[in-house]
């Protein structure tokens, strides 16, 4: 969802490149698509008669080679591309696969929109909805009754979902909510136009249905958070923080192969999923071992809990409907990323199938992570401390009113974390009254409906190989008895999840529930299977009724854990075609096969997220809120793998009152230099 008529990064197309250059250099099969390859893919589709003036590219991305092929790392392997093409003139959605090596289309399928759903929302459609409504007599009459003109109103183009409204089957729809904009730099979210919503047929460029319950007072608060009248004087008590690595970072990046402190992986990027981490390995004591074959956030959904007719349909799949990778930001040194930064600039296709480079779209850096381990021992006369650090691979995306950061962290001790950072502006509404049960009052007369941000991580596990299993670990309290006379005993219960039907599970904080993923064919020096443990946050799952439309379409969010047998085609938690899909498929359909997952090649799907009851402090712009999960080695190593981490350099762990500062002067290319609190550096 967005008010922008263009994505956060300008639509600057890369120049065409002769097709002969596409295969000039050997590539790893998991390299990101290049601008040359996107040009070539478009040429192949055009020569096949699949691209005309009315054709739009809803998605274009790399088809990753099969898992067995990837293990061989065959350089120069055939590159396959998937394209989702929408032709408005023919009312036709195509799912096409092509080979860059042969220059041929290898498969095509026409979608049935009623059964299969629609292709993702186009960037072009963000602006179309305002054009359609500005020419609609009913919409204009509704604005006139509110003392407004179309020129004063911005319309949020919002995915439609699937509901019981009549005359919608098979149509490509968006729903539009209006916001008054008082001047070009005004933030319209402060002025929601309530009591009015338009259901727009973007294919036929007409209003399908309009709900207008008459004028509602438009909130008059100021939402311009950079306005000195709102923010006040900039504070002067924040002294600079300098992040310096005079010898450079400890990681290396060659192509998309990233190595750091025993870790190595390949960094991928997809217009739909954003960051994709491939082939995560860890090396320790001369042994390189696989941990995860592929890790991504396969879907995220933002369902709203307001039952009013203007908002009861608000459920946004930001990955499957809006493509979080396509909407990624270009990051700025010292603002989005701080320290010695290495950037990657992924390339995506625009609506016309031309490549668009997202300059500095991926940020890679390492950062201090506090104490790694520490102990003062009077018996041994020792006092040892080591500092931790982590490798950070991240990107930020803007999807309408919200901005999301996707952060993958790798630690020295083998820990893997994912963190989502939610910020931006909460979706607003005119508050019916102060006691309204489904929204918070965040400013006088301004409400923010309750909602959730729910994510699905797809983790294609490969702990020491493909033979993996999952066990559920619960704390068990024991009653007093002959074996527990003081009542202090507790133990841990291990439950094997042997089949897919047994592996649909929920977190339980009262039991300290975690899930242990192990390889029964690979034993550590204690004779136990090597493994990793998934630690969930245990926040609420999908809050909507079980028989609601969104519960069917976002079934992945109804449980914290799903485990499936690996299948190449099972990539997305909410399905391939999420936009206006009726639901009832995907993860529940996967587990309905009830495949054996004990000692098999398996995929762990972890649902997590935030339930947001907005606060006044979330207005006019929301401080970052976070959610995520942790994977910790559990029997994967024979002992603490960080014993070989050296202590900090001499003079850095002193006990005096000295303060050390880096020498003054300029900063090297790729360094952010001092953080000055952002004054004049990260704003406009």
From Swiss-Prot:
Ca(2+) 2 binds at residues 500, 590. The modification 2',4',5'-topaquinone is found at residue 402. It catalyses: a primary methyl amine + O2 + H2O = an aldehyde + H2O2 + NH4(+); histamine + O2 + H2O = imidazole-4-acetaldehyde + H2O2 + NH4(+). Induction: By histamine. Its cofactor is Cu cation; Zn(2+); Ca(2+); L-topaquinone. Binds 1 copper ion per subunit. Can also use zinc ion as cofactor. Substrate binds at residues 316-327, 399-404. Keywords: Copper, Cytoplasm, Disulfide bond, Manganese, Metal-binding, Oxidoreductase, TPQ. The active site is at 318 (proton acceptor), 402 (schiff-base intermediate with substrate). Cu cation binds at residues 451, 453, 612. Homodimer. This is Histamine oxidase.
């Amino acid at each position: 969802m967005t008010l922008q008529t263009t994505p956060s990064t300008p639509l600057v197309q890369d120049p065409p490149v002769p097709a002969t250059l596409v295969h000039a250099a050997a590539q790893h099969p998991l390299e990101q698509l290049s601008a040359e390859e996107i040009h070539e893919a478009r040429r192949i589709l055009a020569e096949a008669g699949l691209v005309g003036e009315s054709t739009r590219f809803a998605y274009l991305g790399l088809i990753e080679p099969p898992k067995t092929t990837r293990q061989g790392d065959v350089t120069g392997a055939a590159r396959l591309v998937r394209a989702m093409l929408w032709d408005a003139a023919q009312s036709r959605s195509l799912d096409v696969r092509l080979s860059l090596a042969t220059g041929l289309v290898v498969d095509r399928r026409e979608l049935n929109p009623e059964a299969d759903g629609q292709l993702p929302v186009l960037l072009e459609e963000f602006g179309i909805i305002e054009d359609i409504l500005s020419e609609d007599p009913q919409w204009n009459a509704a604005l006139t009754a509110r003392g407004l003109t179309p020129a004063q109103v911005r319309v949020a183009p919002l995915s439609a979902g699937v509901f019981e409204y009549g005359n919608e089957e098979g149509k490509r729809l968006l729903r539009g909510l209006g916001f008054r904009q008082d001047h070009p730099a005004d933030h319209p979210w402060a002025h929601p136009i309530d009591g009015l919503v338009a259901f727009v047929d973007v294919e036929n460029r007409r209003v399908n249905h309009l709900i207008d319950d008459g004028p509602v007072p438009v909130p008059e608060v100021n939402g311009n958070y950079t306005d000195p009248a709102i923010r006040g004087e900039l504070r002067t008590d924040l002294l600079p923080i300098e992040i310096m690595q005079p010898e450079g970072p400890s990681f290396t990046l060659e192509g998309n192969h990233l190595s750091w402190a025993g870790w190595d992986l390949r960094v991928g990027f997809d217009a739909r999923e954003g960051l994709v981490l491939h082939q995560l390995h860890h090396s320790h004591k001369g042994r390189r071992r696989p941990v995860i074959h592929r890790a991504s956030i396969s879907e995220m959904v933002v369902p709203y809990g307001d039952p009013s007719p203007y908002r009861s349909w608000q459920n946004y799949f930001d990955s499957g409907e809006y493509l979080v990778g396509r909407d990624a930001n270009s990051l700025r040194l010292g603002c989005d990323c701080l320290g010695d930064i290495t950037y990657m600039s992924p390339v995506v296709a625009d609506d016309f199938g031309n490549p668009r480079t997202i300059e500095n779209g991926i940020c890679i850096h390492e950062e201090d992570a506090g104490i790694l381990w520490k102990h003062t021992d009077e018996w041994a006369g020792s006092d040892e401390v080591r500092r931790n650090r982590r490798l950070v691979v991240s990107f930020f995306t803007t999807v309408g009113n919200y901005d999301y950061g996707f952060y993958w962290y790798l630690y020295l001790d083998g820990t893997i974390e994912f963190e989502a950072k939610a910020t931006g502006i909460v979706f607003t509404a005119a508050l019916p009254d102060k006691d309204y049960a489904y929204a918070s009052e965040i400013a006088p007369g301004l409400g923010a409906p309750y909602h959730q941000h729910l994510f699905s991580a797809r983790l294609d596990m490969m702990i020491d190989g493909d033979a993996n299993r999952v066990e559920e670990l619960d704390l068990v309290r024991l009653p007093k008895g002959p074996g527990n006379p003081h009542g202090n005993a507790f133990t841990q219960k291990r439950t094997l999840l042997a089949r897919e039907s047994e592996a649909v599970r929920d977190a339980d904080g009262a039991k300290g529930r975690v899930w242990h993923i192990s390889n029964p064919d690979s034993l550590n020096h204690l004779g136990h299977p090597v493994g990793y443990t998934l630690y969930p946050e245990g926040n609420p799952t999908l809050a909507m009724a079980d028989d609601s439309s969104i519960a069917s379409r976002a079934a992945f969010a109804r449980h914290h854990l799903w485990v499936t047998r690996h299948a190449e085609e099972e990539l997305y938690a909410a399905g391939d075609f999420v936009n206006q899909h009726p639901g009832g498929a995907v993860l529940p359909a996967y587990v309905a096969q009830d495949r054996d997952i004990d000692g098999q090649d398996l995929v762990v799907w972890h649902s997590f997220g935030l339930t947001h009851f907005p606060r006044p402090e979330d207005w006019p712009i929301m401080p970052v809120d976070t959610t995520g999960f942790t994977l910790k080695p559990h029997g994967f190593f024979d002992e603490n793998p960080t014993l070989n981490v050296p202590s900090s350099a001499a003079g850095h762990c002193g006990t005096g009152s000295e303060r050390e500062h880096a020498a003054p002067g300029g900063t090297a290319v790729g360094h952010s230099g001092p953080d000055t609190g952002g004054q004049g550096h990260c704003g406009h």
